[in-house]
From Swiss-Prot:
Favors geminivirus replication by up-regulating the host cell cycle. InterPro entries: B30.2/SPRY, B30.2/SPRY_sf, ConA-like_dom_sf, RKP_N, RNF123/RSPRY1-like, SPRY_dom, SPRY_RNF123, Ub_conjug_fac_E4_core. Keywords: Membrane, Metal-binding, Transferase, Transmembrane, Transmembrane helix, Ubl conjugation pathway, Zinc, Zinc-finger. It comes from Arabidopsis thaliana. The chain crosses the membrane at residues 551-571, 834-854. Its EC number is 2.3.2.27. One of its GO terms (biological process) is protein ubiquitination. This is E3 ubiquitin-protein ligase RKP. It is found in: Membrane.
């Protein structure tokens, strides 16, 4: 392993190997012995002791009698001390440094309290810091003016931190810190800049877990920074020389919430730099103690040394077993005596040489040498002082997990693995587990063990030096090379996650030694609750201080997901394997304690519920009588009989099917969205674990899990399958101690962890995967242009652009591959699918209970929806899309269609989330079929969609309508589109409109208003660009979006005229009149406002096909609207409908009408519709319509002129409507008695309930008596 910390103290990996002699061959029970060739006459016992302690030959005099610890101590104090006593004499000159020292004892380098500006909290003594103020700065108490010095900073967070050096003259304020003044120098990896009054680009971006080395060379007047031992180059040169007392101080500045750990030399550096000294002087006698550990290492019987090496050192043999006890006891006596002499030595050794000694004894890679390590622990733990050094060992192991770097050549035993493996073995010792649990920083260290260092662009370049993607021009060997790399990294991640699970299981099994006695799981439960409490608000834009690292939360999510999905196998005996069914895969009766929702626990106080805040809901829905209840139901009870797929049915859900996908092969098949058939190597467990397979074939899944404290394993033999699918019972289990770690509580924590930590990672993964596709397209387009261009200048620019695009693609490929490795392993996908099944059934069951449903936390719904879509879009795909919903998640369809307009959900963003899910799913044929086959969707969704079309949700509703109504418009004549139509929902939408006239009227009014607004906005945006004589990217993007929205709305309106033409042709003519005005309004803006060339320029973006932005996209629905109304008019009796042609002819803008329809006839429809006979026939109908319109307008022209003349020469009658000046004022508004025509009043009241004369609230509209008596044959009142 390449970690420097594993080599601190230079402990030799060579241990005394005692090979079997002839006597051992005869009796295998005897101890191993070292070969003996007695050429010198020296006895073997003395020679063996000399070898163990590294003494020269004959240094130990003849020994008579038995060797005991007192004799060995004498050897240590005499011969060994003489040989190594001068090791701790400082060889290097520590001139040029002074440490401000307060009190007695050796000087300790730390922060100078009076220098702190802002608010810095000590998270963990001595130097784990966090800024609580917006900007905090501080200096250390060490001043340097000569020599080469360094200190290290381990980043707990990766935000804005300025690390470096400053003099006393550097002022610290709430806005200025290190690097913001003369003689002040800093590096900030978040902004990738160095600071000395001004910022300049420098270095690499940093991530949480990085170790930054801050080095200053006052001999050459230079400052360097290192990231994980790699030099970032000289940051500053020619810095000013200063004298004693006026030198440079280590200094840091942190923004709010940023954390780091400073090491000035209190323990060995993780990445020491040759020639640079630590600011804190090393403790005395640390080298002597290190040599003692080296001696102990030689004492161990290890079979990994060669025979030749042993024979070259030893020429005689002696029994090691006889020497181990006295020698090891004497070494430990001396070792702990040294520790007592210097209080600083325990930390220096515990985080340095002693840790390296343990790691090398145990081995950093499998197979581990547990027996040798146990022998070491047995000896050291006999000494009461051992707790001093093991406390620092645990600290070092946790810190090592935070900062360990994955190295490809060391996979799979790389990164945090060696530290986790050693920690798991140590904590099997009860005394060490108790010591860890009793420490003040148990939870902080536990978080450290669950940490994993992140990777930035440069790290991924080292992890994946070779990159390949489908269609790349790279050598074919790159594909296999990247495949091997992904396999190696996947295995490494699996090893790390396995050790994290082992550690958590140890904590779960641990029983704290307290009174009254606690049950297993209480320690883990307390840690989990405190962690969630600390991370309240972690999902906010500005997270509060103290928030845990994302990697900790993600690791904990993986641990809990594995427990709930794959079971607690490591807690079970081999006889109980058949009972070990994961909680999420356990079929039959399900249950959930309502107390998780109805109790306002501290870690839930700030969590928003579906109905709002807990304090607000509790006033309307008291919870006193429900807190102790358990909700029970049968799996699948909320599904339709024909769609029900459960763990108990013959057809199994997707999470229990053997779809095995090779992660490396997904590189070849990106974008195909098909599951692979080969078995992957990215999981440490079988792709279809045995207990899941057993569960799928079992008939009952409510067996009690042996040795597992849980509230979810109680069976109710009397429940069975009853007509009442779910029931509520008193919570008898609640009388058991609350320290029990229940699986339902783990599920609750799992969803919250997903919401605050895992979901953001999936969003990043989605970004890189989608950006990769875009970058590949740009790269391919650039390659095409290079082949077609002949100009040298153009080729040069294109090649530069190509290099940039290629770098972008490679970066995206690496990030995408890393996310697939870390997030999309097979068992995680299986567990997440089962999680979605479980949660959606829970929500549907609780939805029947208003008093409980409103208390469900919002993150339940958000996590469910996000997890569902992550699995749906996963790459490689979890299962084929044709079975994704059908075999297990049909309940999800039921939930989204019944709750996207649920009044009990107070947060409109959540309703939008459900609505957007529908909008996305109906874009795919296989998912649309699932909607058509879902009873709740066909019964509830059509009317609910019409009602949801409002000022907030009109965009997703429009997209849904557009998908459902495909194939019913003029533009659908284009080949292929009609094959994706949904005749089922088209009929359901038509029926919903016919059966609810008020709903239809409201919907059409909103549709008219919205389309008018989008057309106006589009026209204004185009005009603004034309006036500025340039097309700005933002304005162009805005125009494209508004144009697309307008086209979509027009197509929805076209469908309305196709499916329910009588809404426009019968009844009042308000809808038809508004439709006519809107058509002319659109035609006017599309044909006269802007010239064609600028219009196309304002819409067309790079890489977008011309047919997607042509005028025909918006004009085609207008043709369809007119033709739909004409066809409906021909099928109805003339007296029962309004005159469409007459209404167009009566408009006051005949020129707009004529030129608009003439433009439609002459427009080139290529790309919008196909050129078949149906298309020609449709245009022929439009031409006939225009002919009739011209004739009607011509016949009405004399009458129009006469009417216009009369208006100019006579006064307007008192009874004429003063709004439209076209009709008679035949209605009165109550209570203000203002009069107008009934048509104007009703149209106004569609959007406003106040009088348009005096703004009084309208109570009633009273029509004149003779008007009320005028009715047509169907009983509809005629419009005046």
């Amino acid at each position: 392993m390449a970690e420097d910390s594993l080599r601190v103290g230079m402990i030799s990996s060579g241990l005394a190997v005692l090979l079997n002699g002839e006597d051992a061959k005869e009796n295998s029970s005897k101890a191993r012995i070292v070969p003996h060739f007695d050429y010198s006459g020296h006895r073997p016992l003395e020679r063996t002791i000399e070898f163990i302690f590294g003494l020269a030959e004959k240094s130990v005099g003849p020994l008579d009698g038995q060797v005991d610890s007192s004799l060995i101590r004498a050897v240590i104090k005499n011969q060994f001390s003489k040989l190594h006593g001068d090791l701790d004499v400082s060889v290097s000159q520590r001139e040029g440094i002074s440490v401000v020292h307060h009190g007695v004892g050796p000087p300790i380098v730390g922060l100078e309290e009076f220098s702190i500006c802002g608010d810095i909290r000590i998270v963990k003594p001595p130097l784990v810091l966090e800024s609580l103020a917006l900007f905090s700065s501080a200096r250390a108490n060490a001043c340097i003016w000569k020599g080469k010095w360094m200190y290290e900073v381990a980043l707990e967070t990766s935000g804005i931190q300025q690390l470096g050096w400053a003099t006393l003259a550097c002022p610290f304020t709430d806005q200025k810190g290190v690097g913001d003044a003369d003689d002040s120098y800093a590096f900030d990896g978040r902004r990738v800049s160095k600071w000395n009054k001004e910022a300049e680009p420098y270095g690499q971006s940093w991530v949480a877990g990085d170790v930054i080395g801050c080095c200053i060379d006052l001999n050459c007047d230079e400052i360097y920074f290192y990231r994980n031992g790699v030099s970032l180059g000289a940051a500053f040169t020619g810095i000013r020389k200063l004298g004693p007392g006026f030198g440079y101080y280590p200094a840091i500045s942190l923004s709010q919430g940023e954390r780091c750990e400073l090491n000035f030399g209190a323990y060995p550096f993780k990445y020491p730099v040759d020639g640079f000294q630590p600011l804190q002087e090393a403790p005395t006698r640390f080298s002597f103690a290190t040599e003692l550990l080296r001696c102990f290492s030689r004492l161990l019987d290890r079979p990994d040394r060669s025979l030749a090496d042993t024979l070259s050192r030893l020429r005689r043999f002696a029994s090691v077993e006889e020497l181990f006890c006295p020698v090891s006891s004497a070494i430990c006596d001396e070792f702990f005596y040294i520790l007592e002499q210097d209080p600083l030595l325990a930390e220096y050794l515990g985080r340095g040489a002693f840790l390296s000694f343990l790691l090398e004894t145990f081995r950093t890679q499998a197979p581990h040498d547990s027996s040798s390590l146990d022998k070491v622990l047995d000896v050291f733990l006999e000494f009461p002082q051992s707790h001093l050094i093991f406390e620092h060992v645990v600290n070092a192991l946790a810190c090592g997990c935070k900062t360990a770097t994955l190295i490809l050549t060391e996979c799979p035993y790389s990164g945090p693995y060696p530290y986790l493996a050693l920690a798991c073995h140590l904590f099997k010792r009860e005394e060490l587990m108790v010591q860890w649990w009793r420490s003040l920083h148990f939870e902080f260290l536990f978080e450290g063990f669950l940490s994993c260092r992140s990777s930035n662009k440069h790290d991924l370049q080292h992890l994946m030096p070779v990159v390949w993607w489908p269609g790349s021009s790279e050598d074919i060997s790159y594909e296999s090379s990247m495949g091997f790399t992904i396999s190696a990294l996947s295995e490494a991640i699996n090893k790390i996650e396995e050790k994290q699970r082992n550690l958590c299981l140890l904590v779960i099994q641990f029983i704290p030694p307290v009174s009254p006695p606690q049950l297993p799981g209480s320690a883990f439960r307390g840690f989990l609750q405190n962690l969630l409490l600390k991370n309240r608000g972690a999902d906010r834009t500005l997270a509060p201080s103290g928030v845990t690292r994302n990697s900790v939360l993600v690791s904990l999510f993986s641990v809990i997901l594995h427990f709930l999905s794959e079971g607690f196998a490591m807690l079970k005996s081999s006889e109980a394997v058949h009972h070990n069914v994961g909680f999420l895969h356990r079929g039959g009766q399900q249950k959930f304690p309502l107390s998780l929702f109805l109790k306002n626990d501290p870690h839930r106080a700030d969590i928003t519920r579906l109905g709002g805040l807990f304090s607000h809901i509790s006033k309307s829905y008291p919870t006193d009588d429900q807190e102790e209840e358990i909700m029970r139901w049968e799996e699948g009870c909320m599904d339709d009989e024909q769609n029900r797929v459960t763990h108990a049915t013959e057809q199994k859900p997707c999470c229990c099917l053997a779809y095995d996908t090779d992660l490396t092969k997904s590189l070849k098949d990106r974008g195909k969205n098909t599951a692979q058939s080969s078995r992957g190597r990215c999981s440490s467990i079988p792709e279809r674990s045995s207990h899941v397979a057993a569960e799928c074939s079992a008939g009952s899944f409510s067996e009690e899990i042996d040795d597992k404290p849980s509230t979810s394993n109680q069976s109710d033999p009397d429940f069975g399958y009853r007509p009442v699918r779910f029931m509520r019972t008193a919570l008898q289990e609640s009388r058991i101690s609350s320290a029990i770690l229940s699986e339902e509580e783990l599920l609750d924590a799992l969803l919250l962890l997903y919401h605050i930590a895992v979901a953001p990672n999936f969003k990043q993964a989605s970004y890189y995967m989608s950006h990769q596709s875009q970058s590949i397209s740009l790269l391919e387009e650039t390659d095409k242009q290079i082949r077609e261009r002949a100009s040298c200048d153009q080729i040069k620019r294109l090649k530069e652009a190509r290099n940039n695009y290629k770098e972008d693609v490679m970066d995206c490929v690496r990030h995408s591959a890393w996310f697939r490795i870390s997030l999309f392993s097979r068992w995680k996908q299986r567990g997440m699918y089962a999680l979605c099944m479980w949660v959606v059934q829970l929500l549907l069951v609780l939805s029947k209970m208003d008093s409980v449903f409103v208390y469900i936390p919002e993150f339940y719904l958000e996590s469910l929806v996000d997890c569902f879509h992550v699995l749906r879009k996963s790459d490689p795909p979890f299962v084929p899309s044709t079975t994704f919903i059908k075999q297990g998640l049909s309940s999800f369809i039921t939930f989204v269609v019944t709750h996207f307009n649920d009044s009990r959900i107070s947060n409109t963003d959540l309703k939008d989330l459900l609505l957007q899910s529908i909008s996305v799913l109906v874009q795919y044929k296989e998912y649309l079929e699932a909607f058509e086959n879902n009873e709740a969707a066909t019964r509830h969704m059509p009317a609910a969609l019409l009602a949801a079309f409002d000022n907030r949700s009109w965009i997703p509703v429009t997209n849904i309508f557009l998908r459902l109504c495909k194939g019913s418009g003029f533009s659908s004549l284009k080949n292929g589109e009609s094959s994706f139509s949904s005749t089922v929902f088209q009929a359901l939408l038509r029926d919903a409109c016919i059966n609810d006239g008020e709903l239809l009227s409201t919907f059409l009014n909103r549709l008219f208003n919205t389309l008018s607004w989008t057309i106006t906005e589009f026209s204004v945006s185009v005009r603004e660009m034309q006036e500025k004589y340039q097309v700005m990217e933002f304005q162009q993007r805005k125009c494209c979006v508004i144009f697309e929205l307008s086209s979509n709305l027009a197509r929805v309106l076209e469908f309305c005229t196709y499916a329910m033409p009588q809404a426009f042709l019968a009844g009042t003519d308000t809808n038809l009149r508004r439709l006519t005005e809107l058509i002319l309004f659109i035609l006017n803006h599309m044909t006269s406002a802007v010239d064609d060339e600028f219009f196309d320029l304002s819409l067309r973006r790079q890489g977008q096909p011309s047919e997607k932005v042509s005028r025909g996209i918006l004009l085609a629905p207008l043709v369809g609207i007119i033709l739909n109304l004409l066809e409906a008019s021909e099928d109805s009796k003339p007296k029962q409908q309004h005159d469409v042609i007459g209404l167009f002819a009566s408009m006051d803008c005949p020129d707009t009408v004529y030129y608009g329809f003439q433009y439609l006839l002459e427009y080139n429809w290529d790309g919008c519709v196909s050129g078949d006979d149906a298309y020609v026939k449709k245009l022929g109908q439009l031409e006939n319509f225009l002919s009739h319109l011209i004739n009607r307008a011509s016949s009405q022209e004399p009458e129009r002129k006469e009417e216009s003349f009369n208006k100019d020469t006579t006064d307007i009658e008192d009874n004429t409507c003063c709004i439209c000046y076209a009709g008679e004022a035949n209605a009165m508004i109550a209570p203000c008695s203002h009069r107008s025509c009934y048509g104007c009043i009703t149209r106004h009241l569609l959007n406003c309930q106040r009088c348009f004369f005096c703004n009084a609230t309208v109570i009633d509209v009273i029509r004149d008596k003779e008007e009320e008596e005028e009715e047509d044959d169907d009983g509809h009142k005629r419009s005046t």
